[in-house]
Amino acid sequence: MQTINIQKLNLLDNSKVLDLGCGEGRHCFGAYMHANLDVYGFDLNPDDVQKAIDNFPQFDEKSDTKSCSFGCTDATKLPFADETFDYLICSEVLEHIPEVDRAVDEIIRVTKRKGKIAVSVPSFFPEWVCWSLSKDYQLTPGGHVRIFRYKQLRKMVEKRNCKFIEKHREHALHSPYWWLKCLFWKNQDKSYLVNKYHDFLVWDMMKKPFITRFLEKMLQPLIGKSTVIYFEKN
C-alpha cells in the first residue's frame, strides 16, 4: 500500500531517488519498478531497513540500468552532499521528529534544484480523533509528536524556496480502523470490531472492488488519513 502517487513524480530514467523514512521499502520498490533509477531507502529503524533488504529480492530486476539500496540514518543529519537527489520521498515521517525544522532543512538541502519532493503526514482531523480517543496512542514510544495542519506543512516547505505543485489525500477507509484501535487501545488485539475491520481492509486491498474504491474516493476529502503534498525545489 503506497501513500505517495509515484506517477505524479514523473520519474525520469538515470535519476536518483531518496526515500527518507523508507520503513520496509514500499515506496522504494514502487519507484524502482517504475523507471531506470538509483533508489536509496534510508530509515532510523534498523529492523525495518533489514526487512526492506530481505524483501527486495522479489522485486529485483537484476538490471545494470537500475539499483535499490538501503541504510540507516537520522533525518536531521543526512549523510549526503548538497543537491544529490532528483526526487525525494518522505512519507509518514515528519510527525515523528521533534526537530522537524532540521529534518525539512535536510530534505531541501539534498534535493537538486528543479527536483521533486513528495511529503505525506497524517491528516489533521483523523489524527485529532485518534489523539482524542486514546492518550496511550499519543504516548507510544517513537510515535507521533505533533499533528500537522495542511497549510502549516505547505508553508514550512514553501518558505524554503520550494514551489507547491499539488496535493491529495489517501486511505480514507483506514481512518475508522485507527479510530477503533484507539477506542479499544488496551484490548485492541482481542477486539472483534478491530479484527473484523482489519479483515475488511485486507480484503479490500486484495480485491479492490468498485464499490469500496468509489466510497473511498468520495470520503478522501473528509477523512483521508494521509495528506500528500508535492513540491518542486526552485
Regions found by a protein language model. Name each.
Residues 162-172:
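Conserved S-adenosyl-L-methionine
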Residues 57-59, 135-138, 182-186:
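Short, hinge-like loop/turn segments at secondary-structure boundaries
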